[in-house]
Amino acid sequence: MAFVDEAKFFVKAGDGGNGCVSFRREKFVPKGGPNGGDGGKGGDVIMVASSKVQSLIDFRYRSHFKAERGVHGQGRDMHGRGGKDCYMDIPVGSVVKDSETGRVLADLSEEGEEFVVAQGGSGGMGNPHFSSGSNRTPRVATKGKLGEEKWLLIELKLMADVGLVGLPNAGKSTLLSKLSAANPKVADYPFTTLEPQLGMLHFPMRNSCIIADIPGLVEGAHQGVGLGHKFLRHVERTKILVHVIDASADDPFSDYDIIGNELRSYKEELADRAKILVLNKCDEFDFDKDLLPDFIEARGLEPKNVLFISAITGEGVDKLVKLIGDIIDDMEYQELKQKREEERLQDLKKQKEEERRQELKKQKEEEQAKDE
């Protein structure tokens, strides 16, 4: 199945039902009052983030989504039923934009998260609303309001914990297949991977994590060169970036700098993302490790986060798995620690507010006692 991470489509919320002009027609009641019902509200168009949907491919075959209009009001004070909402399942990690302005309307990054992308029109009012002392037989009702309609753009940003980045033919796809059960297309020529590939990395005694192989970036990718510009947004949500460098290349350090510059040019905060440097194909080339300390220091890397591996033979892959797991564990610990600190500060704030309220209450009671 093709991987589609961008789609344009049209949504139309339901129009409101019209109000009704009607009067009581009963035996022995020659001049019955108005009893026209109100129109029902039009249905909304609602987007729902669902893990069951992995791609936007369905939008290739259906580009228009419409909610049901509200039912018209009827006589005998019968109000119209509201129109049924139109629910759209989209992948978790989708960003919804206004197609014309490019303004971000929603970022659905949690399972089950919902967003009303188009509001249904309100129902029209029946003629009882227009009855008055001077007009007991109003022959007027209002029409329902039109539902919202608009063209929208969805961009999918993969919800991966780890992103594999590197120049074409650095060995990312082979590494992904070693790390997970994924089976990406692998060959010895650039741009074999034409779309992001996902794999699941399982740890003993830990939760699993998702790894994404981002298609080969090249110099100038953030400006539209090569294929990488189409997929740079998929690295935004990753917790860890694994830079896969071909150790047998003419200048592997330069290759690292190219990717680092592209990520930084696309979004500055990516420069501060947790990084692992993997020098791949160490079985094919005797790398001069004496050059490594100066490079690590100049780029601000942590020595323990620099590994030599061979994705083909599996050499060093176990160390990489352990390192990824350790970094994720540390991140989760720091997140939990921060959350608990925020809760502690919130509780302290509430405690001080309560003490202040009690103090004011006591002062008020003392003042009342003096007045008495």
Swiss-Prot record:
Residues 121-141, 346-372 are annotated as: Disordered. Its main location: cytoplasm. It comes from Desulfotalea psychrophila (strain LSv54 / DSM 12343). It is an enzyme of class 3 (hydrolase). It is found in: Cytoplasm. The gene is obg. An essential GTPase which binds GTP, GDP and possibly (p)ppGpp with moderate affinity, with high nucleotide exchange rates and a fairly low GTP hydrolysis rate. Plays a role in control of the cell cycle, stress response, ribosome biogenesis and in those bacteria that undergo differentiation, in morphogenesis control. Residues 160-329 form the OBG-type G domain. Mg(2+) binds at residues 173, 193. This is GTPase Obg. Keywords: Cytoplasm, GTP-binding, Hydrolase, Magnesium, Metal-binding, Nucleotide-binding. InterPro entries: G_OBG (IPR031167), GTP-bd (IPR006073), GTP-bd_Obg/CgtA (IPR014100), GTP1-OBG_CS (IPR006074), GTP1_OBG_dom (IPR006169), GTP1_OBG_dom_sf (IPR036726), OBG_GTPase (IPR045086), P-loop_NTPase (IPR027417). One of its GO terms (biological process) is ribosome biogenesis. Monomer. HAMAP family: GTPase_Obg (MF_01454). Pfam families: GTP1_OBG, MMR_HSR1. Residues 1-159 form the Obg domain. Its EC number is 3.6.5.-. The keyword rRNA processing does not apply. It comes from the Bacteria. One of its GO terms (molecular function) is magnesium ion binding. Belongs to the TRAFAC class OBG-HflX-like GTPase superfamily. OBG GTPase family. Its cofactor is Mg(2+).
